[in-house]
């Protein structure tokens, strides 16, 4: 009999198929980050027409273009996903509060990345179907959510972790607005204080932070109520695809 302290629902992805799923999530995020880094920094390509003015000028050095790249919320989100997946792989059975907060933060931030892009930015994007764009704004968000739903870690998320998910977005906001005040450049038009009134920017930021808290709470509740059998069934389907075992067969985990 498995004791509650060692129940599979509360543990990290120890089984091979779960680890492969988490590893795929990690590689997806890393691929997206490496692709856009090479494209934006080392190729030195001119910015697309829909780029905010002042970002990625051809005369900038690689270090300056790297700073431009990390002004994007999207890049912070994908970086956090990669970090969270790496920590889950290295410490699958941990109950570290810091790692659980990072995992929840990555889920929330990458979800917001996808939602904001596809509802507010995609319509005017000039590189909608590019490899880097789809990797960052579609594949990484979808794979990250599927990984959590199917492979876990399950039972990690709690409502008391919610205050912690605002730390990284707050750091991004401080970096973005301090840098914008100094250089006069911003990553997104809707927070560009050169063209948008402060009150509108504050309202938008407050709304996004509110959505972040709601998403975080929703993920905590889903993690609490999602039946273990549903995850186990999903796991058997994944194993049937990846290991070619019959879906109905129960394998030892």
Where are these regions (language model features)?
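Alpha-helical transmembrane segments in multipass membrane proteins, preferentially the mid-helix core
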Residues: 141-157
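Juxtamembrane "helix-exit" motif on the non-cytosolic side of transmembrane helices
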Residues: 117-126
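Perimembrane loop-to-helix junctions flanking transmembrane segments
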Residues: 47-66
């Amino acid at each position: 009999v498995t004791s509650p302290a060692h129940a599979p629902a509360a543990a990290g992805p120890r089984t091979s198929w779960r680890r492969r799923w988490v590893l795929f999530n990690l590689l997806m995020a890393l691929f997206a980050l490496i692709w856009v880094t090479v494209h934006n920094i080392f190729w030195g390509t001119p910015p697309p027409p829909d780029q905010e003015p002042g970002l990625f000028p051809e005369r900038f050095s690689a270090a300056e273009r790297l700073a431009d790249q990390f002004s994007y919320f999207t890049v912070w989100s994908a970086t956090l996903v990669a970090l969270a997946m790496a920590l889950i792989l290295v410490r699958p059975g941990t109950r570290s509060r810091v790692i659980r907060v990072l995992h929840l933060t990555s889920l929330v931030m990458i979800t917001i990345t996808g939602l904001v892009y596809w509802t507010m930015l995609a319509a005017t994007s000039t590189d909608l179907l590019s490899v880097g764009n789809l990797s960052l704004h579609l594949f990484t968000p979808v794979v990250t959510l599927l990984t959590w739903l199917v492979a876990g870690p399950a039972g990690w998320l709690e409502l008391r972790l919610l205050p912690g998910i605002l730390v990284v977005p707050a750091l991004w906001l401080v970096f973005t607005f301090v840098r914008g005040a100094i250089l006069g450049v911003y990553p997104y038009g809707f927070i560009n204080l050169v063209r948008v009134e402060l009150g509108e920017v504050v309202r938008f930021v407050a709304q996004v932070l509110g959505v972040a808290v709601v998403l975080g709470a929703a993920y905590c509740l889903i993690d609490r109520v999602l039946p273990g059998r549903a995850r186990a069934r999903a796991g058997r389907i994944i194993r049937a695809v990846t290991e070619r075992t019959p879906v109905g067969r129960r394998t030892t985990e």
